[in-house]
Regions:
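N-terminal alpha-helical scaffolding segments that mark the starts
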Residues: 1-87, 95-103
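Alpha-helical repeat/alpha-solenoid scaffolds of the HEAT/ARM/MIF4G superfamily
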Residues: 1-9, 15, 22, 42, ...
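Alpha-helical interaction elements in eukaryotic regulators
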Residues: 51, 55-58, 82, 86, ...
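Short amphipathic alpha-helical segments and their helix-coil junctions
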Residues: 55-74, 136-143, 239-253, 387-394, ...
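General structural signal for alpha-helix termini and helix-helix connectors
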Residues: 72, 143-146, 372, 396, ...
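Eukaryotic scaffolding regions of large macromolecular assemblies
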Residues: 391, 401-543
C-alpha cells in the first residue's frame, strides 16, 4: 500500500488505462502513516498533479466503478471496495487542493485531461471531467437504494459531494458573475430525471434515517478496528483543511436528540447546499430558452443580481404527496419528473429532528417554497409536533444567534397567515410544557403558549439584541393571531397586558420626545439610538 500511494503522489504519470489504478483501488488500505508523511504526501500530490493529472484520472475511475455498481444485478464486495476507496482518496486530496488553491478558477484541480488518451473512448467528447463525475455520482445516489451492502459507498459519496461543493466557501458572502464552482455548476446542468431522483432519494434518506450496520466493516479500516492509511490521511488533513466542513457546520452544529444517522444528516446537508445554490447571470451571457438552467424572469437584471434557475430548488418546490393519485400530479401540467414522497413521514421526521438547525432550514424551505406541503402542514391536527420544538428553541433564544431566531420566526409568520392555523392552535390543549421554567403550565392551549413565548422573545430582544426586525416579526405573528384568539390562559392574558403596558410607556416616551420643541438635532447619540430601536414599536402602536 505504501508503494502504491507513493506512486500516486509521485511525479510519474500513469495512463488512465494502466493496471496501476485497479491495483491501487483494490488495496485493503490497512497501513497507518504518521502525520508528517501524510502532509508531505498531500503536498506532493497537489504539486505533481499539474502534469500527472492523477486527480482527474481517479475521478474517472470512480465513475466507472459507480457505473458497474449501478448496472450489475449483483455487486461483489471487491467492486464496492474499489468505488469506496476511489471516493475516499478523491475527497481527501480534493479537500486539500481546494483549501490551498491560490486561484479562484480552480486551475490547481487540473481536470482538463486529454480525451484522446487510450481508455477514454467511453467519455463523450463534449463532456468535461467535472460533468462526467457529477453525472455518475448523482445518478448512483438517485438510483441505488441504501442497503447494508451499499451504505458505506453512499456515505463516502455524500462526503465527497460536500467536498466538491465546498468551493463556494472560498468566494465572497454574495454570489457574483465571476464566481466559478466547477462541480456544483456541473450538478446544475444535469438532466431533470437525475435531479428529481436525487432530491427524492436525499429526502427519503432524511425521513428513513438509515443506520450503518453495527457488525459491518468499512474497507478503509483495518481488521483490528484501527484507522487505516486513508483514515489517517483524513484526520491529518482535517487539521489543515478546515474550510469546507467547519464552515458547513453552521447547518449541523446542533445535533438532534435520540438516534442519529450520519447518512441522514449528510443527505440533508447535501440537499440544502444543492437547493440554496445561486449562480449569477452575467450581463453578457446569453441564456437559451430551452435550457434547464434558465434565468428567473421575475428578477430585474438592471436593479438586482439575476440568478439562473436552480433545478434542485424547483424539484423540491414541486414535490408532491405520494398519496396523491398519479393522474392528479399529471393534471397539474408539471414539466418533467416529479418528486413524490409521503408528506406524513416527512412531517413526522421534521418534528423529531427540529432541534437540529439543518432540519429547521429544510422546514423553512418547504413551507416557503412548496405550496402543497404548506397546505398539508396547515390541515394537520397535531401541529404541536412542529410547533413545540420551535417554541422551545425560541424560549432558549439566549443560546441562539439572531439568524437562527429569524428562521424560526419566519416559519411561524408564514404559518400564521392562515386563519385555519390560527384557529387550530387555540383548540389544541397541551397537558404540560416541561421545558417552560418560569411557572408550571398545565392544560394550556398551544395558542396561549405561542403568545407567551413570542412576548418573552420580544422582551429578550429589547433587553439584549435590540433588533428592530425581530420586533417586526414577533408583533406581526401576534397581529395575525389576534383576530382568532380564543380562550387565552390567564398567564397569556397577563403577559399581553404586560406587553401593552411596556409598549404604551415607550409610546408615550417617544411621543413626548417627538413633540418636545426643546429637542435639538444635536441631541445625544445614545438617545438617538434609543429612538431608532423603538421606532418600529411606535409604528405598531400608532397604527
Amino acid at each position: 500500500a505504501e508503494q502504491m500511494f507513493a506512486a500516486l503522489v509521485g511525479d510519474r504519470a500513469y495512463p488512465v488505462s494502466s493496471e496501476f489504478w485497479t491495483q491501487l483501488l483494490e488495496l485493503p488500505l490497512t497501513q497507518q502513516w504518521p502525520r508528517d508523511r501524510v502532509l508531505q504526501a498531500c503536498h506532493a500530490f497537489a504539486q505533481n498533479n499539474y502534469h500527472t493529472k492523477h486527480l482527474a484520472k481517479i475521478l474517472i475511475h470512480l465513475v466507472w466503478c459507480l457505473q458497474e455498481c449501478t448496472s450489475a444485478s449483483s455487486v461483489s464486495s471487491s467492486v464496492y471496495r474499489k468505488a469506496i476507496n476511489a471516493a475516499y482518496i478523491s475527497s481527501i486530496f480534493l479537500k486539500f487542493i481546494i483549501e490551498n488553491a491560490k486561484a479562484d478558477n480552480w486551475q490547481e484541480l487540473c481536470l482538463d485531461i486529454d480525451k484522446d488518451e487510450k481508455g477514454l473512448e467511453n467519455i463523450p467528447s463534449d463532456q468535461s471531467v467535472e460533468y462526467f463525475l457529477m453525472k455518475g455520482v448523482l445518478n448512483y445516489i438517485g438510483s441505488v437504494d441504501v442497503s447494508p451492502e451499499s451504505c458505506y459507498l453512499h456515505h463516502e459519496l455524500l462526503n465527497l459531494m460536500l467536498v466538491l461543493m465546498s468551493t463556494q466557501l472560498c468566494s465572497g458572502p454574495s454570489p457574483e458573475p465571476k464566481d466559478v464552482h466547477p462541480f456544483i455548476d456541473a450538478a446544475m446542468l444535469q438532466d431533470s430525471s437525475i435531479v428529481a431522483s436525487v432530491v427524492q432519494k436525499l429526502l427519503l434518506n432524511f425521513v428513513r434515517r438509515p443506520q450503518i450496520p453495527s457488525n459491518g466493516s468499512h474497507p478503509v479500516f483495518s481488521d483490528d478496528g484501527g484507522p487505516g492509511v486513508l483514515q489517517r490521511v483524513g484526520s491529518a488533513a482535517a487539521n489543515f483543511v478546515l474550510l469546507p466542513y467547519y464552515t458547513f457546520n453552521y447547518f449541523v452544529s446542533a445535533s438532534a436528540e435520540g438516534a442519529t444517522s450520519q447518512l441522514a444528516d449528510n443527505s440533508l446537508l447535501v440537499l440544502l447546499i444543492l437547493i440554496h445554490y445561486r449562480k449569477c447571470i452575467s450581463m453578457n451571457e446569453s441564456i437559451p430558452t430551452d435550457s434547464v438552467y434558465m434565468s428567473d424572469s421575475n428578477t430585474n437584471v438592471k436593479d438586482a443580481p439575476a440568478f439562473h434557475e436552480n433545478p434542485y430548488c424547483k424539484a423540491l418546490n414541486n414535490a408532491k404527496d405520494i398519496q396523491f393519485d398519479h393522474a392528479d400530479v399529471e393534471g397539474n401540467a408539471q414539466n418533467g419528473p416529479v418528486v413524490r414522497l409521503s408528506f406524513a413521514s416527512l412531517f413526522d421526521a421534521l418534528g423529531t429532528c427540529l432541534k437540529d438547525e439543518s432540519s429547521v432550514l429544510l422546514l423553512y424551505s418547504l413551507v416557503h417554497g412548496n405550496c402543497d406541503f404548506q397546505e398539508y402542514v396547515l390541515v394537520r391536527t397535531d401541529l404541536d409536533t412542529l410547533l413545540m420544538p420551535i417554541l422551545e428553541m425560541l424560549y432558549n433564544a439566549s443560546r441562539k444567534t439572531s439568524n437562527q431566531i429569524y428562521m424560526l420566526l419566519i416559519i411561524l409568520l408564514i404559518l400564521s397567515q392562515d386563519s385555519t392555523f390560527n384557529a387550530s392552535v387555540h383548540k389544541l390543549v397541551l397537558p404540560s410544557v416541561p421545558w417552560y421554567q418560569e411557572r408550571l403550565m398545565h392544560q394550556t392551549s398551544l395558542g396561549s403558549l405561542m403568545v407567551v413565548v413570542l412576548i418573552r422573545t420580544i422582551k429578550y430582544n429589547l433587553s439584549k439584541l435590540r433588533d428592530v426586525y425581530l420586533h417586526t416579526n414577533c408583533l406581526a405573528i401576534l397581529a395575525n393571531m389576534g383576530p382568532h384568539a380564543h380562550r387565552l390562559s390567564a398567564y397569556a392574558s397577563q403577559r399581553l397586558v404586560s406587553l401593552f403596558d411596556m409598549l404604551s410607556r415607550k409610546y408615550a416616551k417617544l411621543a413626548e420626545l417627538k413633540n418636545d420643541k426643546a429637542l435639538k438635532v444635536t441631541s445625544d447619540q445614545m438617545e438617538a439610538d434609543i429612538i431608532s430601536d423603538d421606532t418600529v414599536l411606535y409604528c405598531y402602536l400608532a397604527s
